[in-house]
């Protein structure tokens, strides 16, 4: 576990219209059809809603590397809350988190998303270590590790007592 928290450098974004682009990695955070892309690339192939509905446990856990703008999280939360009676625990690791200003811009692009609005209202701090949020009256639990992926995965391996039901691995 991270013994103390330190400041972590935020993502450096260049907003090209409604599209955030990482100046560090010269890569977009999401495409114009980002929500449909999450459905197509992550949710449908991994049958998240079907598998969450079928599990006997009261929760379903998704983990990913790279929280970015939280789009995968937001779309997953909307699907789980809207189509099942399960609690979603979403775990992510992020090396360069968004600034509060960027969270507000993301939320403005997704006014219909409860999770995007919640992250804009209470952004994750620019500090290393684990940060947690509860949303949708406790039906969505978010755990994000800010820092090096090896440190985050090490902590996860040491302390995550429940299985991860689905992993979202991006090609970044």
Task: Describe these PLM feature segments.
Residues 165-172:
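A short SAM/SAH-binding and catalytic strip from SAM-dependent methyltransferases
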Residues 69-74:
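Glycine-rich SAM-binding Motif I of class I
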Residues 1-63, 77-114, 118, 138-140:
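Rossmann-like AdoMet
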Residues 79, 160-161:
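Short, solvent-exposed amphipathic alpha-helical segments in soluble enzyme
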Residues 66:
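Conserved glycine-centered beta->alpha loop in an early N-terminal alpha/beta scaffold
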Residues 59, 163-164:
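Local beta-strand N-terminus motif with an aromatic residue
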Residues 104-159:
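S-adenosyl-L-methionine
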Residues 97-98, 149-151, 172:
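Short acidic/polar capping segments at secondary-structure boundaries
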